Amino acid sequence: MRLKINKKVWRLEFVKAAAMQSKRNWGECDLPSATNPLMTVRQSLQPKAMLNVTVHEMLHACRPELSEEAVTETADVIAGVLFKLGARITPPTV
């Protein structure tokens, strides 16, 4: 899926753990300076975790200057509220 964030086109992909740079990660995000920036989210996550990780990686893309702690705290709040409001992510099928 292609997304425009801060005037740059990003790809967002939901992938198997084996496709992640580290199999321990739930999500990953390139730096905005990358030629073709990519965000990946593990596709096997439960709905609440998938929403949280997607918001988390999008925050990294939008605000790369934020610390990991700030991104985590902000994603937890935003994703928690969105989840309570009924938001869920349905990854595109390939």
Name each model feature, range by range:
Residues 52-61:
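Active-site recognition of the HExxH zinc-binding catalytic motif
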Residues 1-48, 64-94:
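Metalloprotease/metallohydrolase-associated module, dominated by Zn2+-dependent proteases
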